């Protein structure tokens, strides 16, 4: 199993196809309409964080909330923006409120890519996956996962491990495509929602063991030969 967890890069994986409808830039309002009308997901409008364009994942960002060290820059809904997207401004961000239709498992990009390859090779139905420009992958899973996560990790033997793995649940938000996070770039779909998984995201237990292992390996890894996904 270890040989499946060498270094991967985002460009080495098959990205979600654009399709004929996706060849023009999708606006925030168009995306929000799809999320609510087609998939039945709640959305909210957020004030985007600002930063220096093209400055990379380590660039400082300024959150409209005013907190100097905001833990979630740009991920606060504007007043009255809950449950719908008021996206008249081109720079408005679209947010998913988690804990409703789904929760979100959040892992480092490298670990997430490795786990995704492994899961799909095993035939696991992964569900929608977001790629954030902050260097994170976010896996949409069944609602209620955040509440059960400590017990799930305990049952799988990962409760004592220092894993860079979190879960966004009730009361939290994640940025939805095509939201641009200040100075970093847009959020993208690595695996798009489909009719099969949008209304019924996978149970976290189906993904969690592989994700936890990949996160653990990411902390231990020394120089290893790169393995490129075919």
Where are these regions (language model features)?
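Conserved phosphate/metal-binding and DNA-contacting active-site motifs used
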Residues: 1-135, 140-230
């Amino acid at each position: 199993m270890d040989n499946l967890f060498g270094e991967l890069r985002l460009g080495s994986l098959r990205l979600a196809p654009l399709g004929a409808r996706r060849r023009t830039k999708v606006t925030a309002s168009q995306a929000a309409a799809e999320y609510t009308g087609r998939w039945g997901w709640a959305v909210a409008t957020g004030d985007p964080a600002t930063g220096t364009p093209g400055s990379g994942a380590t660039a400082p960002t300024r959150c409209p909330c005013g907190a100097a060290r905001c833990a979630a820059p740009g991920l606060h809904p504007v007043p009255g923006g809950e449950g719908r997207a008021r996206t008249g401004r081109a720079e408005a961000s679209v947010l998913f409120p988690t804990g409703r239709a789904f929760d979100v498992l959040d892992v480092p990009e490298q670990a997430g890519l490795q786990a995704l390859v492994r899961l799909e090779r095993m035939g696991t139905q992964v569900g929608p996956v977001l790629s954030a420009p902050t260097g994170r992958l976010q896996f949409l899973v069944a609602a209620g996962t955040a509440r059960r996560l400590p017990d799930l990790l305990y049952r799988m033997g990962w409760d004592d491990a220092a894993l860079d793995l979190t879960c966004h649940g009730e009361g939290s938000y994640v940025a939805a495509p095509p939201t641009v996070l200040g100075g970093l770039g847009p959020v993208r779909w690595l695996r798009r929602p489909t009719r099969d998984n949008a209304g019924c995201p996978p149970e976290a237990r189906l993904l969690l063991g592989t994700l936890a292992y990949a996160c653990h390996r990411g902390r231990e890894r020394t120089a290893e030969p790169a393995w490129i996904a075919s």
